[in-house]
């Protein structure tokens, strides 16, 4: 069993996403393609603000990362990271075909069985010293 404190490679997740579904992992890599998202609404009607997506890239592969932002608090906030920054990410993995939710440009979506969405949902982002 891998503890959340020991970084793993992104390739390990890509190769066997089902074994990581809803597990917390620690990854290290470089931030790519930070994209702030428009506010979105949860099914309960609550609006969420400050969400963004990015890719985390390590020497083995890359993974889509979602930062959900704050719900119920109308704020305008820039992402906490920038393109090219090295970070350590603690995240919960959402793997495809489990009917789980994932964050997209259209807000929160339910992953259908045929969608190959593997997403890391950020729990904690720590900048690494260069």
Model-predicted regions and their roles:
Residues 2-4:
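Sec/Tat signal peptide C-region and signal peptidase I cleavage site
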Residues 17-18:
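Predominantly extracellular/luminal regions of secreted and cell-surface proteins
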Residues 6-8, 13-14, 24-130:
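OB-fold single-stranded nucleic acid-binding module
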């Amino acid at each position: 069993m891998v503890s959340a404190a020991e970084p793993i490679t992104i390739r390990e997740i890509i190769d066997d996403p089902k074994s990581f579904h809803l597990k917390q992992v620690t990854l290290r890599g470089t931030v790519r393609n930070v994209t702030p998202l428009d506010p979105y609404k949860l099914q309960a009607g609550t609006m969420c603000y400050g969400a963004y997506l990015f890719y985390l890239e390590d020497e083995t592969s890359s993974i889509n990362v979602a930062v959900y932002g704050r719900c119920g608090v109308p704020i305008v906030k820039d992402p906490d990271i920038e393109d090219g920054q090295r970070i350590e990410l603690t995240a919960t993995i959402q793997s495809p075909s489990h009917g789980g939710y994932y964050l997209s440009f259209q807000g929160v979506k339910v992953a259908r069985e045929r969608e190959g969405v593997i997403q890391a949902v950020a729990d904690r982002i720590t900048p690494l010293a260069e």
